[in-house]
């Protein structure tokens, strides 16, 4: 079985690829090594993957259809796991075009490639951000999600709709996964866990939005990967061509509790500055995992404090702090 993972130099893509390589599967990674965040971190991830004989890496942008066709023609994948995207909520306010290019045009290319090469299962990353300002807690796949709070969320909802259309028209088995806030080793420097940890270690003041009245469904990256692997061999049935599922811990954590856990793990106190809610931000996220659990079984969620300690230990070792 040949598997292509786009975004393989990214946080989740790298972690998934490494786990599948440990299972001796043939993995082909595609990533453009975007400078959105530290390219050296991405290259370090790729160098880890290239230690496996069954891994092959392609540096390519998913918006470059000609190059993507060459890669797919060479591999002819059985399964396509699409994790490449322009991430970030706040950055979408500064550089909207990059979201249109990567998340809409790039995803359109992914759908076309899935059609042309008759992939047996397309799995793609959506996001909990599609729930926008939804007041119903926990977030369910049955909730109304047509009022996104930012462009990033709008592109992810668009991906779900585009996938549904292609799946219906061309019988492409596809599964969208709404990831909730992911943390853990090899994490993204632009995300809150890394930003907060770096601020604590450097004794810098942390700007805490909405005066600390936030909660997030923080989900350990290995738990996300467990979910992805369960989905991998279980494409939607013939009469249910395209499906969307939440993947989270199902346990909301207050932001202040998250900061306290990081403080405890490093033995240092954070300097805090409380500010208001920022444009496009969600106050609370919390996954209803019922649909996923019914379809694939319950994920054994990593203990929050254990996950935080594992993340901190990796950070201190990787950055030689």
Regions found by a protein language model. Name each.
Residues 15, 40-41, 70, 91-94, ...:
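Generic recognition of short, well-ordered alpha-helical segments
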Residues 133-135, 185-187, 191, 291:
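Short beta-loop-alpha junction of Rossmann-like oxidoreductase domains
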Residues 158, 162, 166, 196, ...:
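Hydrophobic alpha-helix immediately C-terminal to the catalytic Tyr-X-X-X-Lys motif of short-chain
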Residues 1-182, 314, 318-321:
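N-terminal Rossmann-like NAD(P)+-binding domain of SDR-like oxidoreductases, especially those catalyzing
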């Amino acid at each position: 079985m040949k598997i292509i993972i786009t975004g393989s130099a990214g946080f989740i893509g790298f972690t998934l690829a490494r786990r599948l390589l440990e299972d001796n599967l043939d993995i082909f990674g595609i990533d453009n090594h975007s400078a959105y965040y530290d390219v050296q971190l991405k290259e370090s991830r790729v160098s880890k993957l290239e230690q496996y004989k069954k891994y092959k890496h392609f540096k390519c942008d998913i918006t470059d259809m000609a190059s993507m066709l060459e890669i797919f023609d060479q591999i002819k994948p059985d399964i396509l796991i699409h994790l490449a995207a322009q991430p970030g909520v706040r950055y979408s306010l500064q550089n909207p075009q990059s979201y249109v290019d990567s998340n809409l045009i790039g995803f359109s290319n992914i759908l076309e490639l899935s059609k042309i090469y008759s992939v047996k299962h397309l799995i793609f990353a959506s996001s909990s951000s599609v729930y926008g300002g939804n007041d119903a807690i926990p977030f369910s796949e049955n909730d109304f999600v047509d009022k996104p709070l930012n462009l990033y969320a709008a592109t992810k909802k668009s991906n779900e709709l585009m996938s549904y259309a292609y799946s219906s028209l061309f019988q492409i088995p596809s599964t969208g996964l709404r990831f909730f806030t992911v943390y853990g080793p090899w994490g993204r420097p632009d995300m809150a866990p890394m930003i907060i940890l770096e601020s604590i270690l450097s004794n810098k003041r942390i700007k805490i939005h909405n005066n600390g009245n936030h909660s997030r469904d923080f989900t350990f990256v290995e738990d996300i990967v467990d979910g992805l692997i369960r989905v991998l061999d279980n494409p939607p049935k013939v009469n249910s061509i395209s499906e969307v599922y939440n993947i989270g811990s199902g346990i909301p954590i207050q932001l202040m509790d998250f900061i306290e856990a990081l403080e405890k793990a490093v033995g240092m106190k954070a300097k805090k500055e409380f500010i208001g809610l920022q444009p496009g931000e969600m106050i609370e996220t919390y996954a209803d995992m019922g649909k996923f659990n019914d379809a694939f079984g319950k994920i054994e969620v990593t203990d929050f404090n254990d996950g935080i300690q594992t993340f901190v230990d990796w950070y201190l070792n990787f950055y030689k702090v």
